[in-house]
Amino acid sequence: MAELEAVADDLDALIDDLDYLPGHFHLEMQLNFEPRSPAPQRARDLKLQREGLRQELQLAAAPQRPAVRHLLGAFAFYLEELDEARECFLEVAHEHPGNLNAWANLAHVYGRLGQEEEEEACAARLADLMGLAEEPEAAGDPQLRAARCLAEQGYAHGFDVGCASPEERARGLAAGIALYDKALGYGQQIPMEEKRGWYFTMATLYIRLDGIFLELGSEEQKRLPAFNRTLALLRQVLKSEDPRHRALAWCYLGMLLERKDTFSTTPMGVHDCGYSGTDPLDCFGKAIEIAKNQPPILNRLAKIFYFLGKQDMAIGTCNMALDVLRDPELNWQAYCTRAKIHIRAYLHDLKRAKMGLGGMPDRNHLACAKADLEEVVRVCPGFKAYLDIGQVYYYMGVDAVQELLAVDEAALNQALVFLAKAGESELGATLPELQLLRGKCLRIKGEDANAAACFKRAVELDDAGSSHTDGFGCLLEALLAQWSQAQLSDGELGREVDAWLRRAQDKYPAARLRQELQRVWRGHTDEVLGLARALVAQGRPALVRLLFETMEREGEGASAPRDRRAVSF
């Protein structure tokens, strides 16, 4: 026993002396920490992130593919798909026998599987590659292996799962950048083209970090050094031989030059890098020019333009991709992105119409989105396509003023059919967006009890800290509708409102919840006053006080931040 303890102490001392530690399962990422969310939500988030990574793997340059495969293996591990995780790491080890993370991650998986001999063999191979064996046999430079190991770990921080706040996401991105810096210190002899791939990922992490700083209202001096460095990194990436990196670097440069106006004076990095007179639109134009014959790159650019709110540019880029490759089976991404742009345009106009700031939204947007999504559903159906086309049919079925009246019963029924298909998939069944849409369809059809059940499920599935309070607001409206139609008694309504308001307080930011309650109260004043009387009669004055305090604070709430799932490009 004493001998084993001595060996363990020696191992701990050795690890403490190391400047870096291979593998992904020790990294300080939320992925590796005890989950905060319930198991179904965590599994959903892991699978959604994994789906995005699989698409990334198809586009990634060869030197970056091991980093993507390591993450796919880590996600499979935490989804209890241990055989899949092992295969991911074995694939890297076979293609790149000197990859440190592959052997470290394999050792971790074998340990979990209880295969001690394989675990020890991986550990021995790892020690040899790191130059820690008594008689090292591995050829090659351990410094280069260390550099690539650290770069792969830095890449992983850009795809963390489970961050509960912007501050947590910022810390993770900063940790990823620090690992890349460390990798550059070890990797003096790394080929320049491979380094440019690192610079590209670093610039991406920096841009996301700056976006968080903007969201948090951070001081200029906190943003400035990183902003200037990002410009310098992108200038290096523009020399890359990889057209994808070059095109995206021009696009990111355009984004940064647009952000320079958020500083009181132009950041010095703009002048140092020679971009003093550069117009952001010229940068976007150069990105499109580089990608003009390559649909995968055009599709990525279109997505970025979509997230930036540049809808005309996004539509044009999608059209270019479809001019090159119209087959929806091979280029479904362009159809999906173009449909999303039309849906967003319709929703933007609908919101303005509800506020009395514009006329009726153009329903041609819905027709265009429907046509694109029908092409996708025909050749490669999936829960996302079903959800999107279900959303389109919902808006085709309701009025274009307040979403209160059915104008096309057949469209509403078709929406429910597509949403049911989306819900058949394991992932689709865990999406709050799907339950919210189902509830809205059922509410318009007059099925308030069924609608309320869907809205409850949407609230249950929402992440803690989510800004999407729509499901809770719709639930309150459905409960009030049932009560006004005598489908719920005063006591039942009071208990339901009490229980779900407490749950909402635990889940949503206070300011955002207040805004949602204000919206419901403004639209249903008579019902709310009736609810208040019923609650007083039930001896629930504290709940009444909370409701009326909410109404009195109208206008205090800050604008809602975007949800985590919507900000990643």
From Swiss-Prot:
- Asked if the keyword Nucleotide-binding belongs to this entry, the reply reads no
One Pfam family name from the record?
A: TPR_8
In terms of PANTHER family, this protein maps to:
TETRATRICOPEPTIDE REPEAT PROTEIN 22 (PTHR16253:SF0)
InterPro entries, per database record: TPR-like_helical_dom_sf, TPR_rpt, TTC22
Organism's domain of life? Answer: Eukaryota
State the TPR repeat positions.
Answer: 66-99, 101-133, 203-237, 260-294, 295-328, 383-418, 432-465
Keywords attached to this Swiss-Prot or TrEMBL record, sorted alphabetically, are:
Repeat, TPR repeat
Does the keyword Nucleotide-binding belong to this entry? no
- SMART domains annotated for this entry? TPR
**What protein name applies here?**
Tetratricopeptide repeat protein 22
